């Protein structure tokens, strides 16, 4: 899930990765939402985008306040950024293939159900590692919101 270069990953590494992942997913939704055919799916996607935006804010605040990061989106381990860029490219390629095959709604709902689950898992990992009460509280709420969004995507996909 996170790049390893022989060094033990720190709590900050996971927060960096979660921030970059949430920000990237938000950008992908912005790009593909207008291409979705289903108004229900567009609504679900915009709701998820809002949750991801709040999530990014929480993680960015934690990076600067709790970890003293000079800038967000600039992880200490460059391999994290490289891995997330590769992950973003793979997601974009999958969605574009779905669009070209006339299956974007189906591919989008499947991929974002999966991507949301991956982000939840990453944030749960942070939650078990952190001793920062403020971050714990905010992540607990964020995870709950992500789970609700994932459940809506899952319900759409099951139709």
Where would I find each of the regions flagged by the language model?
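His/Met- and acidic-residue-enriched segments that coordinate or traffic transition-metal cofactors
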Residues: 1-159
